[in-house]
Amino acid sequence: HLDKLPKEEGPLLLIAAGTGFSQAKAIAEDLLNQGTSRPVHVYWGARTVTGLYMADLPEQWSEDHENVHFSAVISEQNDWEGKQGLLYQAIVADIDDLSICQAVCCGSPNMVYATLDAMVDHGFRQDHMISDVFTIAPRDES
């Protein structure tokens, strides 16, 4: 997947909603096995904390690798003390300069396109995101 992105070394955002984490996990594990020094920000969103079915894994990555950062984002659980809201809200609040970032976005078509649009509105370059959604559910531009 990453070979489809422009050859740059800015921060990589692995953005996953729900079970989309399985794809982000595979990419993260591959990068870590290669010994990447590139900053990697893993954002995993779910409606409730139970949707983060293996949150201990990306937490461990961030403890073991100083270049890896993990943020869990919960949208529908008021007693959650971490980041709340939608994934793109957390991303635009956290990342000062989205123009230097690249992203892999894993989730439903609505989530992927909403995230892309919000990030572009904050300086992200559209051609710096890859997602299977762009192939399986292309946006109707008419």
Report each predicted region and the residues it spans:
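FAD-binding FR-type
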Residues: 1-14, 27-30, 48, 75-76, ...
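Short, flexible hinge/linker loops that cap or flank conserved catalytic cores
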Residues: 5-8, 34-36, 97
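Short, flexible helix/strand-to-coil boundary loops that buttress conserved ligand/catalytic motifs
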Residues: 6, 25-28, 91, 116
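A short acidic Gly-Thr/Ser loop motif
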Residues: 17-18
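Histidine-anchored nucleotide/phosphate-binding helix
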Residues: 21-33
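A broad, low-specificity signal for short, low-complexity segments enriched in glycine/proline
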Residues: 30-35, 63-65
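Reductase modules of NAD(P)H-dependent flavoproteins
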Residues: 39-142
